[in-house]
């Protein structure tokens, strides 16, 4: 025996060790080591754990420095009570403990197979999966680290090892899935791709290798293993599943942009949605006018077309795609409520004469309306409903006196561009028809009342009082020294009381320009010099006057006070109650 000990360290180690059974499950190796150190120094104490559950099996092995100490432990500690149980201490090399030595892998000659007990091929995948899942994360990481080094240093040997031990390859793949190194879908493809490899393998791994990469075993493994790897096969679908999903979404999304613009840009009212503006930018098929609109915005207020849809002859409706507000920044052009928008030279036929804004000496009643709209305006009256309160021109010049505010400050505060435009898109969009009637009647009546103080055009129909075009001939004295039709030049020289006059003249300008387009004598030379800023001022004042009480309440205190003062002064000047 001594010779065997010298020749075989494994046998010597088994002789120096004792088998300890009937160990309480809650016992720790340290506690047992303290007990067995009573008979002599303990080299190590190892508890045996179940590979499937990770729980202790209730027995272990204690190694001493020599065989005599081990024999002493068997004599003195056998039957020792610990936590209510009598420990069983026996020779570790006895025949009845061979299986325990096998499971420990101590290297004793009694171990016949390095693969453990033989299992059926059908159970191999589940057994391997459980064994891998029972490994602590640190040990699993260390295993993968060592395998990586092995593959890097000796790729051919590692390949041969994995081919000869398919259960090891399967376990490594399972570990990679558990550690989320490999997607479950990819793992399945790898397994199925290796179905023909087991034919190259022969020898003792036969019982287990069929369970490794074999196709039947693969299926059973994935069916039987309800653990994280299998669960990840659902959550990990994004690795291989995402491209089809993305393709599907792209396929579904390709027609969508083409269909949406057609639905949105078709009718004028529907084009109110801001999304229409984005679609117009994309330039989808079926909305030819939209792409044109983005490049050159016609001079028609989209709200007029939106409200009644009766202006196809003189207005391209797609302008409404970009929002209800004439000053909608998405429209790319300032379309003030007065309709006087700076023509960039791309909006009117050149033969119709230069725009009113750019040629001060031009007779401003006849041609400018045609020029601003790209064609004659047979029916300008529907535009009367344009100057709605929530659509203040946010880029107009200062209000000149009522608090010294600049409407651009209003724009900066988001008074009109956001709060009012939002209200215009929602509440005003719903009352488009009601607003039309109200603007055509109430505002027209107010316009006539206020215009009566400036002109003798009481007989002019309210329908002709559009906010576009130059002012009609001065048929009556205009108070406060304002120029007849160009009181829009009110700037800073017009008193607040008379400031309403330019507004009303602005409302009557279109009617006069259309109805009296052949009355050049009604204007003085200086009255032709109407600038876009003048019209913007008039439009801004008209918009301010049309703000509802709710809209005014939403404004900052300064702006609210200024608007209230303006309204009060206008009411006083017009004698309104």
Curated annotation (Swiss-Prot):
Region (12 X 5 AA tandem repeats of M-E-A-R-[AG]): 410-469
Omega-N-methylarginine PTM positions: 308, 468, 475
Placement of covalent cross-link Glycyl lysine isopeptide (Lys-Gly) (interchain with G-Cter in SUMO2): 189
Bias-annotated ranges (Basic and acidic residues): 360-373
Compartment(s) where it occurs, according to its Swiss-Prot or TrEMBL record: Nucleus
Listed InterPro entries: CSTF2_hinge, CSTF_C, CSTF_C_sf, Nucleotide-bd_a/b_plait_sf, RBD_domain_sf, RRM_dom
Transmembrane segments: none
Residue span of region Disordered: 206-243, 340-409, 508-532
One GO cellular component term noted in the UniProt record for this chain: nuclear body
Pathology linked to this chain's protein: Intellectual developmental disorder, X-linked 113: A disorder characterized by mild intellectual disability, and developmental delay mainly affecting verbal and non-verbal communication skills. Motor development is normal.
Known role: One of the multiple factors required for polyadenylation and 3'-end cleavage of mammalian pre-mRNAs. This subunit is directly involved in the binding to pre-mRNAs.
Protein name per UniProt: Cleavage stimulation factor subunit 2
Lineage: Eukaryota, Metazoa, Chordata, Craniata, Vertebrata
Gene that encodes it: CSTF2
């Amino acid at each position: 025996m001594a010779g065997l000990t010298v020749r075989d360290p494994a046998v010597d180690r088994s002789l120096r060790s004792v088998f300890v059974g009937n160990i309480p499950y809650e016992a720790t190796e340290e506690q047992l080591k303290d007990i067995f150190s009573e008979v002599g120094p303990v080299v190590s104490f190892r508890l045996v754990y179940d590979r499937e559950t990770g729980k202790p099996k209730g027995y272990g092995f204690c190694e001493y420095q020599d065989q005599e100490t081990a024999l002493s432990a068997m004599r003195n500690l056998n039957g020792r009570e610990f936590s209510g149980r009598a420990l069983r201490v026996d020779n570790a090399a006895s025949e009845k403990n061979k299986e325990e030595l096998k499971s420990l892998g101590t290297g004793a000659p009694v171990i016949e197979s390095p693969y453990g007990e033989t299992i059926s091929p059908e159970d191999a995948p589940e057994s391997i999966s459980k064994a891998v899942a029972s490994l602590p994360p640190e040990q699993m990481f260390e295993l993968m680290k060592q395998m990586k080094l092995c593959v890097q240093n000796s790729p051919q040997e590692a390949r041969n090892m994995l081919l000869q031990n398919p259960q090891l390859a399967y376990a490594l793949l399972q570990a990679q899935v558990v550690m989320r190194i490999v997607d479950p879908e990819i793992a399945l493809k790898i397994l199925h791709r290796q179905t023909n490899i087991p034919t190259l393998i022969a020898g003792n791994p036969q019982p287990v290798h069929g369970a490794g990469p074999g196709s039947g075993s693969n299926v059973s493994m994935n069916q039987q293993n309800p653990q994280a790897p299998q669960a990840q096969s659902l959550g990990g679908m994004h690795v291989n599943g995402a491209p089809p999903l993305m393709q599907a979404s792209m396929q579904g999304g390709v027609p969508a942009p083409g269909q949406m613009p057609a639905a949105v840009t078709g009718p004028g009212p529907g084009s109110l949605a801001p999304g229409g503006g984005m679609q117009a930018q994309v330039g989808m098929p079926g909305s030819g006018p939209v792409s044109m609109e983005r490049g050159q915005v016609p001079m028609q207020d989209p709200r007029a077309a939106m409200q009644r849809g009766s202006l196809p002859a003189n207005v391209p409706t797609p302008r409404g795609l970009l929002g209800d507000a004439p000053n909608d920044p998405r429209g790319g052009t300032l379309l003030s409520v007065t309709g006087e928008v700076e023509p960039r030279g791309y909006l009117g036929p050149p033969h119709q004469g230069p725009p009113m804004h750019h040629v001060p000496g031009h007779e401003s009643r006849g041609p400018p309306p045609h020029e601003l709209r790209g064609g004659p305006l047979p029916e300008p009256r529907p535009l009367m409903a344009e100057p709605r309160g929530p659509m203040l021109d946010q880029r107009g010049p200062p209000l000149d006196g009522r608090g010294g505010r600049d409407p651009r400050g209003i724009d900066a505060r988001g008074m009109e561009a956001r709060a009012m435009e939002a209200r215009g898109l929602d509440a005003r969009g719903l009352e488009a028809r009601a607003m039309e009637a109200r603007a055509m009647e109430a505002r027209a009546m107010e316009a006539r009342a206020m215009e009566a103080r400036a002109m003798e055009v009481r007989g002019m129909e309210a329908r002709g009082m559009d906010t576009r075009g130059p002012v009609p001939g001065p048929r009556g004295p205009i108070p406060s020294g304002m120029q007849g039709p160009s009181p829009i030049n009110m700037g800073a020289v017009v008193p607040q009381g008379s400031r309403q006059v330019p507004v009303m003249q602005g409302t009557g300008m279109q009617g006069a320009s259309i109805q009296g387009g052949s009355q050049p004598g009604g204007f003085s030379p200086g009255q032709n010099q109407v600038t876009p800023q003048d019209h913007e001022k008039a439009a801004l004042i008209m918009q301010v006057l049309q703000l509802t009480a709710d809209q005014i309440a939403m404004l900052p205190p300064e702006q609210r006070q200024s608007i209230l003062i303006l309204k009060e002064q206008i009411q006083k000047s017009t004698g309104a109650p």
